[in-house]
Amino acid sequence: MVCTRKTKTLVSTCVILSGMTNIICLLYVGWVTNYIASVYVRGQEPVPDKKLEEDKGDTLKIIERLDHLENVIKQHIQEAPAKPEEAEAEPFTDSSLFAHWGQELSPEGRRVALKQFQYYGYNAYLSDRLPLDRPLPDLRPSGCRNLSFPDSLPEVSIVFIFVNEALSVLLRSIHSAMERTPSHLLKEIILVDDNSSNEELKEKLTEYVDKVNGQKPGFIKVVRHSKQEGLIRSRVSGWRAATAPVVALFDAHVEFNVGWAEPVLTRIKENRKRIISPSFDNIKYDNFEIEEYPLAAQGFDWELWCRYLNPPKAWWKLENSTAPIRSPALIGCFIVDRQYFEEIGLLDEGMEVYGGENVELGIRVSEISHTGLSSAPMMVWQCGGSVEVLPCSRIAHIERAHKPYTEDLTAHVRRNALRVAEVWMDEFKSHVYMAWNIPQEDSGIDIGDITARKALRKQLQCKTFRWYLVSVYPEMRMYSDIIAYGVLQNSLKTDLCLDQGPDTENVPIVYICHGMTPQNVYYTSSQQIHVGILSPTVDDDDNRCLVDVNSRPRLIECSYAKAKRMKLHWQFSQGGSIQNRKSKRCLELQENSDMEFGFQLVLQKCSGQHWTITNVLRSLVS
């Protein structure tokens, strides 16, 4: 699942991706944030205590840093891990697997456990030794236990999507669904195997399915892909195989908690245009303990990575912890009326592998207009439906340490995000291009044919994206004042770029150009220079502005710098100088042999140094 929670360490962000992806730590190594995001998303932590509330020398240094970065990425991300029998175990002390578990294991046991961990991204060794029917703590708000539900509710088909999942994890997902869903409500379970190469998911899984179906004929269906289609198209495959009035689309590394189904089916029975997400808790990847997560809505940033949000103010005012939480988007696992899902266009099967489809669905439902509709409502919010998170429906989900699903997740998410932007986001599509640091014209990225999706939007009579931002996602920060963006380079040393430096400091630096988030620069019509991430919501204070502080360049939170009337306005024209309006000092490079790349940023009397930025949207007037 893709949703983030904010941290303030050198490991700057962890992103959780839906479906067959998982948790990836976005590492800022050697002052470089490797922005290869994948499944929890940069986001505001919901309130935890209230559930309601010289050239050779330079080259060698670069190589050393890149080598270190590569090693970290291999350990933490491992885009394409070897099979269990092929994986070479790292030194035990280097693996996060043994930080809180496994000290009592023999060396051989640790070796086996580590091989499986490298392959699956979670502790399959431990999972194989846990009962399939293990109990879970009831983490629902206390009021949920007193709720009553209609006797007559629609049946549900539960769909599990997987590729190379550990068999015990998959079986525990199935078992918990069967044990904790009332039998009269659970019509069937559908397993979508996206072309797994793991042999135990063939013969052994077939034996299990045959055993269950021997007692309940046809209860478990298996859909096997002949090639890997990716999470998005796998979900659609599962929907096509489903026959119940309601379809629940889930990852295959979850465990259902007691009473999860009745609240969901009740809300859909009341209004079939509701798309529902349960509230998620965490199954820790190392020791499989259940970690309670605060209640949260689900949103996204301008790269369209999912992120957890604090519930809206209107929800807090209810003072009712059992009330549904209105949510701008979905993180990936959701429950939907089967026919309604088809009416609004399912998922965009022109997307690749993973990412963006959950955001697209949430926006689409929101923008659909009710006017003139017979059977086809628009994209959930824009198109007449709604998205809710239910506090009384709780499901635990494994956040993997790394994912086995794709070698380049970021490229897929970026491409999919641009499809969403071009179809649904109107003039705000520029924000997606800016966040990804991509030219808005001739981006060089083939997003495929979007004709059918544009026709769908027209057919569904969806509202504008501006309406969505104002009415559904008012927390989303708008950046209509940005007139230039990209990386900022000085003519004196063009292989170095302005960089935000370590997260823990406020001193900008110059660093070898890599084009990732720490080097993103945004120049506004009010002559401010933002460096680093585009803060997604108005509640975040992540935006940092370049400021002249006692003749030294510093990065200060923009809102604070403005309130304190600091020197944060800069005259800049493409190929010209960057001069502070008040102090008249220029941002320049100065040779310094003590610095890593031989140069440092200074503010001094202008000497004629020239700066260029990658993308200019409007004329820059100095």
UniProtKB/Swiss-Prot annotation:
Mn(2+) binds at D251, H253, H397. It is an enzyme of class 2 (transferase). It is found in: Golgi apparatus membrane. The chain crosses the membrane at residues 13-35. InterPro entries: GalNAc-T (IPR045885), Glyco_trans_2-like (IPR001173), Nucleotide-diphossugar_trans (IPR029044), Ricin_B-like_lectins (IPR035992), Ricin_B_lectin (IPR000772). Pathway: Protein modification; protein glycosylation. It is a single-pass type II membrane protein. Pfam families: Glycos_transf_2, Ricin_B_lectin. Coiled coil: none annotated. Residues 153-267 are annotated as: Catalytic subdomain A. Keywords: Disulfide bond, Glycoprotein, Glycosyltransferase, Golgi apparatus, Lectin, Manganese, Membrane, Metal-binding, Signal-anchor, Transferase, Transmembrane, Transmembrane helix. Residues 324-400 are annotated as: Catalytic subdomain B. Its cofactor is Mn(2+). Its EC number is 2.4.1.41. Substrate binds at D194, R400, Y405. GO terms for biological process: protein glycosylation. Its main location: Golgi. Disulfide bonds join C144-C392, C383-C462, C497-C513, C545-C558, C586-C606. GO terms for cellular component: Golgi membrane. Catalyzes the initial reaction in O-linked oligosaccharide biosynthesis, the transfer of an N-acetyl-D-galactosamine (GalNAc) residue from UDP-GalNAc to a serine or threonine residue on the protein receptor. There are two conserved domains in the glycosyltransferase region: the N-terminal domain (domain A, also called GT1 motif), which is probably involved in manganese coordination and substrate binding and the C-terminal domain (domain B, also called Gal/GalNAc-T motif), which is probably involved in catalytic reaction and UDP-Gal binding. Belongs to the glycosyltransferase 2 family. GalNAc-T subfamily. This is Polypeptide N-acetylgalactosaminyltransferase 18.
